[in-house]
């Protein structure tokens, strides 16, 4: 429940994504088409123009944004595995972020995408210091950021943001690079040439309010041919390590219990869960799509189209 990122704007580029308390939890989305960079998520960098958003669709397990200009169309999808009768999926701390780019003018176009997340997502307040690092398992590569202090389960009450565990960006897709640096540096580097800094910033620990240390990944989609959309996906996830203080006993989340259980009682790294989700993305996507259709059909039968829209909006809340 601590991993909370919402867009409160009609257009995804109008405002920073936020925690449910209203505090910024900034994610940045950029797309580069034929050497020109556009924003598709977040208001920064301000000197990078926003790609026109033409629609947003909220389904029970996913939100789909669509953008376009004269040359290309971009579809950005956030998929959370919120299927109530499958506890392995429902408890998953992983959200998929997927992109699809297609030509609109019958010409080929070079395209690449960028996803960034600041240290705000891993602290209660920006005066806390964070550290970062990398992990990998097989084809899966990941970069993470978390508070230096790691005050596990110490905070209580409303308006509380998680400041223990680690936020991850992960991908097993080809032509994907990662970096950790100030948010402005990451976005400006991608906007300039479609890449990321060659080395992670080594100035850590650092307070989040000191230049907004952040993570980013960038994927080169190559040449998008007319009639053949290019697609890729990444994962944003949170490893909270411990989820509940139950009568002075720290308990892990259900997903972690199941992960260790599948490892025959041996503690498994978080990258094992990320690798599983990378490999099973198509399976989960199809499962969630079927659930979405069934739930919307039931809600429509019960109360009509608007009732179904409200139900889809409320489902992940």
For the regions a language model picked out, list residue spans one by one.
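An extended acidic
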Residues: 3-70, 157-188, 192
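Short Pro/Gly-enriched beta-strand edge/turn motifs at strand-loop
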Residues: 44-49, 76-82, 199-203
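Short beta-strand-initiation
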Residues: 60-62, 94, 212-216
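Low-complexity, acidic Ser/Thr/Pro/Gly-rich terminal tails and inter-domain linkers that flank the onset
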Residues: 68-89
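Acidic/polar, glycine-enriched structural segments that form the non-catalytic walls/loops
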Residues: 82-89, 100-317
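Short, solvent-exposed loop/turn segments enriched in Ser/Thr/Gly
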Residues: 91-97
């Amino acid at each position: 429940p601590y991993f909370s990122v919402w867009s409160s704007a009609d257009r995804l580029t109008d405002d920073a994504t936020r925690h449910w308390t209203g505090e910024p939890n900034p994610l940045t989305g950029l797309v580069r088409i034929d050497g020109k960079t556009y924003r598709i998520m977040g208001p920064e960098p301000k000197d990078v123009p926003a790609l026109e958003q033409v629609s947003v669709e909220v389904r029970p397990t996913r939100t789909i944004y669509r953008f376009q200009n004269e040359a290309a169309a971009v579809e950005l999808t956030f998929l959370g595995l919120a299927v109530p009768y499958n506890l392995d999926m429902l408890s998953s701390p992983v959200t998929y972020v997927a992109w699809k780019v297609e030509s609109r003018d019958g010409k080929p176009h070079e395209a690449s995408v960028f996803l960034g997340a600041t240290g705000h997502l891993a602290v209660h307040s920006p005066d806390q210091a964070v550290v970062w690092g990398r992990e990998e398992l097989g084809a899966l590569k990941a970069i993470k950021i978390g508070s230096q202090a790691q005050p596990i389960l110490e905070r209580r009450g409303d308006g509380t943001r998680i400041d223990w565990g680690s936020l991850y960006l992960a991908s097993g897709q080809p032509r994907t690079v990662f970096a950790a640096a100030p948010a402005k540096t990451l976005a400006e580097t991608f906007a300039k040439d479609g890449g990321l800094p060659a080395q992670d910033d080594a100035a850590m620990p650092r307070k989040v309010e000191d230049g907004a240390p952040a993570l980013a990944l960038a994927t080169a989609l190559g040449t998008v041919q007319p009639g053949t959309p290019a697609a890729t996906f990444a994962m944003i996830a949170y490893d909270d390590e411990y989820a509940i203080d139950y009568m002075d006993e720290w308990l892990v989340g259900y997903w972690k219990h199941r992960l260790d259980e599948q490892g025959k009682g041996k503690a498994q790294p978080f990258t094992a869960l990320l690798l599983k989700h990378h490999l099973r993305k198509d399976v989960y996507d199809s499962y969630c799509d079927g659930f979405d259709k069934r739930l919307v059909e039931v809600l429509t039968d019960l109360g009509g189209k608007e009732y179904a829209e409200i139900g889809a909006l409320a489902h992940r809340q």
